[in-house]
Amino acid sequence: MASTYSSSLNLELQTTGENSGSWGTKTNNNLQKLESAIKGYVSVAVASTTDSLTASDGGTTDEQSNAIIKLTGTLSGNSTIQCEAVESWYIVDRATSGSYTLGFKPAGGTAASLVAGSKHLMYTDGSTMFDVLADCGNISANGTLTVAGAVEFDGGGFIFNNSSADVDFRIESNGAANM
């Protein structure tokens, strides 16, 4: 009976007694894929409107086995990156240029949008890609909060100095008549 491959990481599952003289190499390949799935990093250039992360049974050169994926390149149209349709998770750094949208999805499934210049914690159930922090709710931070874009309040309040600490508050005008 020949080797088979695991569905999530494409690890080679050797049959007992198979691969005499080469089982060590095959085992090392499997260990390298496990290492990539836990701590691996790969940079992938987005070249077209639909790109697939490479995947290989038993090999160690596939892109999708890596935990961290940096997407680079210049988008020339709305694009989608796809991985295999299996359960997995990724940290994705969208470092592409161009003003087009970029989605990430399992093959044949539903994409999640990747915000330009942002890092995303993603997981897929094999049919839909999810951005874990997209709907995260309350966020607590220690230190200075810097916002590059607009801050919107939709039905919520804005509380200054909730802990009654001795802090200063300042609003500065940009010179417009209304502030």
Segments the model singles out, each with a brief description of its role:
Residues 17, 45-52, 107-111, 127-179:
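Intrinsic low-complexity, repeat-rich intrinsically disordered segments enriched
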Residues 6-8, 76, 109, 124, ...:
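Residue-level signal for pocket-adjacent positions within structured domains
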Residues 31-40, 98-106, 121-136:
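Short, surface-exposed terminal/edge motifs of secreted or surface/virion proteins that either
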Residues 24-29, 116-126, 168:
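Extracellular disulfide-bonded cysteine-rich modules/repeats
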Residues 67, 79, 88, 98-102, ...:
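The right-handed parallel beta-helix/beta-solenoid scaffold, focusing on the short coil/turn
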Residues 103-117:
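Short, surface-exposed beta-strand/turn "edge" patches of beta-sheet domains
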Residues 2-102:
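Exposed extracellular interaction/assembly regions and N-terminal maturation sites
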